[in-house]
Amino acid sequence: MEQEFVALGHAGSDAYAGLETFPNPGVSVVELRSDELTAVCPITNQPDFYVATIEYRPKELCLESKSLKIYLSRFRDQGAFCEALAVQIRDEVTAALELAHEDVDVTLIQKARGGITITASV
């Protein structure tokens, strides 16, 4: 039976149905990286730009990348500190993949603002 994806093949966040997964074809480590993650500072409401790296050691499931792209775009207008955002992403990816926290690593690098770059890893 062919698996159907909600996000794949659809434009924009209207197709967002959560983080979608597919059966692990046998890989032991997956790394996904995006430089399209944005959020806003919860204090100043100024935009923050991130490079996000998600590395996980799959068991039964892998993340479908288009659903991840749409998932990350949902943070665009949300206020969040870098550190809290890293934890939230790790927790939601962990839940979608049905893994333990130690099987998922998330690193966010917040691009410099005011001369300071922040890196948060969980």
Task: Give names to the regions the model predicted.
Residues 1-122:
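N-terminal intrinsically disordered, cationic/polar leader segments
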